[in-house]
A protein has these predicted regions:
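Hydrophobic alpha-helical segments and helix pairs
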Residues: 3-20, 147-177
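Pocket-edge structural micro-motifs
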Residues: 21, 42-45, 51-56, 275-276, ...
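Assembly/oligomerization interface modules of large self-assembling protein complexes
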Residues: 30-98
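Long, contiguous amphipathic alpha-helices that act as assembly "spine/axial" helices in icosahedral shell
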Residues: 80-157, 180-183, 187-204, 315-321
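Acidic/histidine-enriched, beta-strand-rich ligand/metal-binding domains
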Residues: 169-198, 202-211, 215-219, 225-230, ...
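Sequence/fold signature of self-assembling virion shell proteins
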Residues: 215-341
Length: 341
């Protein structure tokens, strides 16, 4: 039996990464599950005139000529799945005390629950990536099980996606004399509503904070903006509230996802996002396409978890969670995305 260096285990730590669905929690608070495979935008209150621009992707290229506008859409279907291998129940779990070993039935239950947590996390990462991309670009590429990838374009105005260049780069400004406040106010004019929050990635925040004017103006005290403070409190270990810059909250987001075993940041380096915590982000979901779910009367649901066995020689057991997520912005111009340089 494989043993740790100490006979008595005091703690067992899973390999963790900084996943925290900040954009979902801050900007996507409404949820609309549908009983149909398609999401119908006209059935969402206040979105009668909204349409998505949908273009297929072939060999990595967006084919605009074959795309078009639609008010009904088929979300990609995701269904992460694991097998519960009987051999796994015979081995000690990482946090199991070697001097007080559990029985295989207990280990099986633990493995099933861990599988479900991993599957939920896999789907949540897809949702957060859609939400971040919607805010950053006003569009994203959607993929799913047996689903040809398509680009979902919410119609963001080009002026709301800004790249610093031509002498406007903050990295070229004198950090002791230059005040970036005027730049931020100019960027904010492109938003369709009031800006009350700015989200930076860590490198973007370091660049912003390098200006003396920023350090002088940043108010790190709490309590003066109660509603906004409520929105950004208890943000988690992947999010840091830095203070108020005038009447705008400054937040730094270092959330990560895992792709092919590699940890990656949701926000690109040197990103600044101007937005509003009251922006109307929508979590929409197509129906669950599973006969067992239909028999149970579960059609309109963000998730459908299942655990089942197949007969045979030998019998096999699996876990899976199914979902058809599509994150949308009612008004993509409520946000302004700036690539700092």
């Amino acid at each position: 039996m494989s043993m740790y260096t100490t006979a008595q285990l005091l703690a067992a730590n899973e390999q963790k990464f900084k996943f925290d669905p900040l954009f979902l929690r801050l900007f996507f608070r409404e949820s609309y599950p549908f009983t149909t495979e398609k999401v119908y935008l006209s059935q969402i209150p206040g979105l009668v005139n909204m349409a998505l621009y949908v273009s297929p992707i072939v060999s990595g290229e967006v084919i605009r000529s074959r795309g078009g506008s639609t008010s009904e859409f088929t979300p990609g279907y995701v269904k992460p799945k694991h097998e519960v291998n009987p051999q796994m129940t015979l081995r000690r779990l990482p946090d199991e005390d070697p001097q007080n070993l559990a029985d295989p039935a207990y280990r099986r239950r633990r493995i099933i629950m861990q599988n479900m947590r991993d599957e939920e996390l896999a789907i949540a990462q897809v949702e957060e990536m859609q939400a971040v991309s919607a805010v950053l670009k006003g569009k994203y590429t959607m993929t799913g099980e047996a689903f040809d990838p398509v680009e979902v374009d919410m119609g963001r105005s080009a002026a709301n996606n800004i790249t610093q260049s031509g002498g406007t780069e903050w990295s070229k400004r004198d950090k002791s004399t230059y005040d970036p406040t005027d730049d931020i106010e100019a960027y904010a004019l492109n938003a369709s509503g009031v800006v009350n929050i700015i989200v930076f990635d860590p490198k973007g925040w370091a660049l912003f904070r390098s200006f003396k004017a920023v350090r002088d103006k940043l108010d790190t005290r709490r309590g003066s903006h109660s509603e906004l403070e409520t929105a950004v409190k208890d943000l988690g270990k992947a999010v840091s509230y830095k203070g108020m810059y005038g009447d705008v909250a400054i937040v730094v987001y270092s959330g990560q996802y895992v792709e092919n075993g590699v940890k990656k940041n949701f926000l690109p380096d040197n990103t600044m996002v101007l937005g509003n915590t009251q922006a109307r982000g929508l979590r929409t979901y197509g129906c669950i396409q599973d006969a067992d779910a239909q028999r149970e009367g579960i059609n309109a649901s963000p998730r459908y978890p299942k655990n089942w066995k197949t007969s045979g020689d030998p019998a096999r057991e699996f876990t899976m969670i199914q979902s058809a997520p599509l994150m949308l912005l009612a008004d993509p111009d409520e946000f302004v995305s700036v690539q700092l340089a």
